[in-house]
Amino acid sequence: MRVLLVEDDRLIGSGVEDGLIEAGMTVDWACDGKHAQLALETTPYDLVVLDLGLPRMSGTELLDWIRKRRDHTPVLVMTARDTVADRVSGLSAGADDYLGKPFDLTELVARCRALVRRSQGRSTDTIEYGDLLVDPERLTVMRGSERIALSSRECALLVELLANRGRPLSRARLQDSLYGWNEEIESNAIEVHISNLRKKLGAQLIRTIRGVGYVVEKET
């Protein structure tokens, strides 16, 4: 899950970024509306977490711009403006959810997951594939009664492959889905994660297509 965080307050932004990353999400952090516009024009996101009180372009103006370009990416507004009138105004402008400051990070994470599930037409975070049951929130895979623990990166990679089953994904595409702007990436990071998943889940789950990328085949 790739999230665009738009927040100008360094302290709040850092805390939210850390919390979302710890929950297994990939986060790009824009500190103003213009920077967020550029990000949205160049990168596909599963969710936008948006503060309304931004420099250069207000959060309300950015939200209006997002919807006018027919971008249906879910938007969660977080703001200190938490009167009923403010909430109604934000939702009417196109926000999908509204969270007043201060807030609990666990609630923010839960709301983020719920918005993405809803946008993808899913009622639960868990993903079934063959005899596997993947739980991105708990970073686990169940095979029958066996519980297999994954790192947050391994889980995010597996979810990306399962969401695109039958379609090969390049190493660059997988890197984009797993790493934010400011994160350093080892040149062989994807290969290492793929190797770990094969060791934990079986060598046949993920197929390498030389010169193209990796794929999890559709179930037959």
Task: Enumerate the predicted regions with their spans.
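Glycine-rich nucleotide-binding loop
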Residues: 35, 211-215
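Positively charged, aromatic-enriched patches within helix-turn-helix-type DNA-binding elements
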Residues: 95, 140-205, 210-212
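N-terminal/domain-start alpha-helical segments
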Residues: 1-123
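Intrinsically disordered, low-complexity protein-interaction/activation regions
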Residues: 199-200, 218-220
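A general structural signal marking secondary-structure boundaries and capping sites
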Residues: 70, 119-123, 165, 182, ...
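Conserved hydrophobic "DFG−1" position in protein kinase catalytic cores
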Residues: 100, 134-136, 141-143, 216-218
